[in-house]
A protein has these predicted regions:
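Bacterial N-terminal signal peptides
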Residues: 6-16
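Conserved strand-to-loop "acid loop" that flanks and positions the catalytic carboxylate
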Residues: 284-301, 330
Length: 356
């Protein structure tokens, strides 16, 4: 991670497309947008919301750094390292090119079929674990985390990448040019969608994302920046910054997250140029299913319950109020089977997939 990017003036100069960070903005007030003079206007139409959404994405990039250009991307050059038969699928251990000098390790589940059938596909993002992608397999070692395996059994093509620096992904944040590990993750996950769309058995218009904890918010972030993702499931993945450990956002500031939240915004939630009210709303009108347990000590459900009604106003404006779903299981930081099963049914419905 290029530490020069933590200097605010240089950072702003390197982001000519991003305006100065907003001040005094209520990030929960979703149905207003600001014109170039800073004056507020009500969001009444789809076109108005497009302006507000653009400002949300801009605010995210002020904290995360800019999304790198996706023009002239290198070939994916997928390499198969290992192959194993599973329950109706073949599981491949692969790596592929995300950008120059970087190959991303991943697991790829490909359903067995006697003839080519176009299928829906899933980006399955793992929680924090030294196992990385293997945490979401049948033998991941923790109950209620095998969603990559379970979705493959349902007939989906599934890709489960490592997030830097977990699993087999020996990534050096100090050596890259990203402002944040979060943005590197977003770029990688968009490349995973590229790979899924390159497969002959994948219907490119039927792709979803799912994750727990680290994977939960990474699924959301990927969904904001990549509208090819049609349904997003997040377990224990988010709460507004003021509700994250009572507003202590230090946990968001490591290299693999967003260092600018500390170095530029002084660990002050009021200064961070985006919040999860906006991030969730930016997924609209696509299906978003949030599992937010009552006893999750990381991501306080009280904040989630404040944010969902605000985001639903946007979903309602876009004619998809029921596409936003919240479940609050009575458990701690977990993804219980009954909620997973319900989430899978929402994925099936959103992507038109019949369970095998």
């Amino acid at each position: 991670m290029n530490r020069l990017f933590t200097a605010p003036l240089l950072f702003a100069a390197l982001l000519p497309g991003l305006t100065a960070e907003p001040s005094g903005i209520d990030h929960s007030n979703l149905l207003v947008y600001r014109d170039p003079s800073g004056d507020e206007h009500p969001v009444k139409t789809h076109a108005d919301w497009a302006k507000r959404r653009g400002q949300i994405v801009e605010g995210m990039q002020q904290a995360m750094g800019p999304l790198p250009s996706r023009t002239a991307l290198p070939p994916l050059d997928m390499r198969v390292r290992e192959q194993a038969d599973g329950d109706g699928f073949t599981r491949l251990s692969i790596d592929f090119v995300t950008e120059k000098n970087d190959r991303l390790p991943a697991l790829l589940y490909r359903p067995k079929a006697k003839r080519l059938v176009k299928r829906a596909a899933i980006l399955a993002l793992h929680p924090t674990s030294p196992l990385g992608k293997h945490r979401v397999t049948k033998k991941g070692g923790v109950p209620n985390r095998a969603y990559a395996y379970e979705l493959a059994k349902r007939g989906y093509v599934v890709i489960a990448p490592d997030y830097p620096p977990f699993g087999d992904y020996k990534y050096d944040f100090e050596a890259d040019d990203y402002v944040s590990g979060t943005m590197k993750g977003i770029f990688n996950h968009m490349r995973c969608v590229d790979l899924l769309q390159s497969l002959p058995e994948v219907d490119p218009g039927r792709i979803g994302a799912i994750g727990h904890s680290l994977g939960g918010h990474n699924a959301i972030f990927a969904g904001v920046f990549d509208t090819r993702i049609r349904v997003i499931v997040s377990s224990c993945g988010w709460t507004p910054f003021h509700d994250y450990y009572g507003g202590n956002i230090r946990g968001w500031t490591s290299d693999r997250y967003m260092p600018l939240l500390k170095t530029r915004y002084g660990l002050d939630p009021d200064r961070v140029p985006f919040d999860f009210y906006e991030v969730v709303a930016a997924l609209a009108p696509r299906v978003f299913f949030s599992s937010s347990p009552l006893q999750d000590s990381n991501f306080d459900v009280r904040g989630v319950k404040k944010a969902i009604p605000k985001a639903r106003e946007v979903y309602r404006l876009l004619g998809q109020a029921d596409a936003l779903q919240l479940r609050t299981p009575d458990c701690a930081h977990d993804f219980p089977v009954e909620v997973r099963d319900e989430a899978y049914r929402f994925i099936d419905q959103a992507l038109g997939q019949a369970e095998n």
